[in-house]
Amino acid sequence: MRIASFFTVLLTLLTLNITPASAERIRDLVNIQGVRGNALIGYGLVVGLDGSGDQTMQTPFTTQSLTNMLSQLGITVPAGTNMQLKNVAAVMVTAELPPFGRTGQNIDIVVSSLGNAKSLRGGTLLMTPLKGVDNQVYALAQGNVLVGGAGASAGGSSVQVNQLAGGRISNGAVIERELPSTFGTSNTIMLQLKNDDFSMAQKVSDAINRSGYGGTASPLDSRTIQVLAPHGNSSQVRFLADVQNIEVNVGIQDAKVVINSRTGSVVMNRDVTLDSCAIAQGNLSVTINQQANVSQPNTPFGGGQTVVTPQTEISVQQTGGVLQRVNSSANLNNVVRALNSLGATPMELMSILQAMQSAGCLRAKLEII
């Protein structure tokens, strides 16, 4: 009885030390080759702005675009007319044509100011053709622009929250032309992993072959899995619906630290670990202060000249860093606690993480975006 209890306790302890492997569906791991969106772009005008449009003297293309649009509507602007408009803005319109997009389907669009308009709030986008890379028109956009920012100005002072020079129009474009599709015409489908990994490519292939489709899937490289599929659109839709819901044991993910060099943000996943190391971080600041000294002659009629001489002061301040020990950390909570103990700013932490990886103390892949 005691032996049975001992083995029960031992089995429980071993179970607690096992890292559970998560399972994900194939639809979350792969993309289907050829099933993707296509970028659309167009140039248009936003009208109805409350005095926050382009300054036409500095953006002549806005006036030219408005003149061309009016001429298409049968309105002739006299030659040499200097239109001082404040409620019109030239904009670029972007959208994505979804895969299998059909004629008459609505898509979202993004409107961005091209000139020096202060705000697009309250404006209306006039009919704008959206073209693809082949210079063909695939959609027409029009509607009221929704701007997420807010701002006000008076007496030379201004307050602004978020940006006002761009906005969105939900369902603001209508598809007028469809892209030809080759879906269903071939007996092979290429599944592309979102992250290249030889082991994951083999796992996805094995999972498909074990799920009643034996011999249909084979990995071609670290990103592509070739799958034999039935011919025809309806048959391939049913086949992919089954394949995409197959679960794959993804196991332990690669440890990764992502650094945004523009914003200074640092993001790391739960598999990041640290080895023991010692770190000293010092700061060097250089301050340059320049003032203009004006020297005038004492006698106004003595023929002297007023001379402006610059006076420059340069100061250098260096603060030494104390050598600090960073203990080995086996989980994310300990990693965060160890890095916070350094008291470094996010920008300093970026340099520290790079140095730790070079020294072999950071057990993770460092990616800078």
UniProtKB/Swiss-Prot annotation:
<keyword id="KW-0975">Bacterial flagellum</keyword>
<comment type="subunit">
    <text>The basal body constitutes a major portion of the flagellar organelle and consists of four rings (L,P,S, and M) mounted on a central rod.</text>
</comment>
<dbReference type="GO" id="GO:0030288">
    <property type="term" value="C:outer membrane-bounded periplasmic space"/>
</dbReference>
<comment type="function">
    <text>Assembles around the rod to form the L-ring and probably protects the motor/basal body from shearing forces during rotation.</text>
</comment>
<dbReference type="GO" id="GO:0005198">
    <property type="term" value="F:structural molecule activity"/>
</dbReference>
<keyword id="KW-0574">Periplasm</keyword>
<dbReference type="GO" id="GO:0009428">
    <property type="term" value="C:bacterial-type flagellum basal body, distal rod, P ring"/>
</dbReference>
<dbReference type="Pfam" id="PF02119">
    <property type="entry name" value="FlgI"/>
</dbReference>
<keyword id="KW-0732">Signal</keyword>
<protein>
    <recommendedName>
        <fullName>Flagellar P-ring protein</fullName>
    </recommendedName>
</protein>
<dbReference type="GO" id="GO:0071973">
    <property type="term" value="P:bacterial-type flagellum-dependent cell motility"/>
</dbReference>
<feature type="signal peptide">
    <location>
        <begin position="1"/>
        <end position="23"/>
    </location>
</feature>
<dbReference type="InterPro" id="IPR001782">
    <property type="entry name" value="Flag_FlgI"/>
</dbReference>
<comment type="similarity">
    <text>Belongs to the FlgI family.</text>
</comment>
